[in-house]
């Protein structure tokens, strides 16, 4: 097959999809406004969109929209793909829809349908148009399909749930030697409980709530260490967070990882961690959370529908209000003081991940969807 993706090339999720299909021998093209970043993926033809860069975000959006639409149309005519697959409906999905190319698949990521359309009437119309034009829309969470039907009138027979899942060949326990070296590198003592936030340093992940909880956690457990993985974060917001950390006097308890890290590196960080915190107000069931659970970390997550697909409060996770640092403090301290929960939760979470969220199995499902749409 000749597959053309429209997606953000510096996203680890995009990179996994294009690499999988390229490795399977398909001809893979990726249209993106950004390069791959720190990695290089062989046998994937990257088509970079040219963009204007006005300082004001809204002006940038208005200026780039027609420019990107024209470029995407020209590229699709040049590539002549068998199938188009756009990830993130609010922009790449809209661009793909305007080409009138079929078969055309959309993948909803979460905020592109849960948050962004509520902030802008223009974006809402773009999302509605893209959904209307798509042959199939994939979601990772059960509730997301119901939401698309209820809020956008998308017929159920055009929705397919294919969890992205995680690579269980990478994300698992057993990196003892690497964990030892990482603790030494980060100067974390052997008896120090480790908490990790592996979501991007961005306001939507309620990082500020985590920061406000830390001094209360370290008051009870002074040797507790929190690791922040910056990822594809917001640099201005990161400055605000670092300033607040200094104001609270908790610099010695924080480890910032200011770069993208490979999946293998992430697995070692997660194996090092006792507790994982993920508290956005809207989300699909994030792969980053499942990766942490597969490595044995206790999940503390926001009390939202997405996480309830697999998790139950106090049974294999802890739910909190993402606006409440006090509740986060209490649950984190409870986890630190009850280390036996780590093994109990791990056994439950490992089972559902292996059954339903194995990346290798779900990638095959996506390939089968492509073939069905092409009548092969």
How should these model regions be labeled?
Residues 76, 131, 268-273:
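Short alpha-helical donor nucleotide-sugar binding micro-motif in glycosyltransferases
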Residues 298-301:
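Short hydrophobic beta-strand element within catalytic cores of glycosyltransferases
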